[in-house]
Amino acid sequence: VPGNAVQLAAGTKVEQYLTLGKGEQVVALVPLTDGPPLALGTAQGIVKRVAASELGTKPEIEIIALRDGDRVVGAAPASDAAELVFIADDAQLLRFDASSVRPQGRSAGGMAGIRLSDGAHVIAFAVVGGSAFDAVVVTVAGSTAALAGTDAGSAKVSAFTEFPAKGRATGGVRAQRLLRGEDALTLAWVGSDPRAVGTDGSVRTLPEPGAKRDASGQPLDAVVVAIGTAIR
């Protein structure tokens, strides 16, 4: 997608630039430059880095060989100095050095990123740069039995530094203590200056940052469906 094609004030429908197949969705918007490798994380806990030279200039390319039932949950450029972060729906978070993931070719299937518990899957994958000292982790917990869009659940915002780094392909640490009636994380995000929105695109208020790593969340006033950051 040409960088000057999107009107930030009104937005532009993705369908104007690409055709999404059944069940497909956009998970990331990344620049194609000669910069650091592109890091990918999947729902089954696979991680991969693809060298920028492998991406080429074709309008559509396959950049990872997915296992049956797997899907990409996040992607972002990641230099060797960056850290990669997985968050699973069972409230486990793992962060490790990007340098432990050697860049592979487009057709490769990646390598183990996080060791998941039985039945768990990754809901968020992020890249944190070496200088992102203000990064935070936002987690939202709720009930998987509730109808979509009806359970606001609880949320917390913790400093990224609250979470100890571990090695690739290991288990994570607890990212939020679930309250009664909650059985999973429904949403998670890592970055700086988080902004949350509801189903209609309206702004939602998140708790103040500063929560302990494994603390429980604070009840939300309304459902949060997406978290991002301001475009600067």
Regions found by a protein language model. Name each.
Residues 1-232:
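Short, structured "edge-of-domain" segments at secondary-structure transitions
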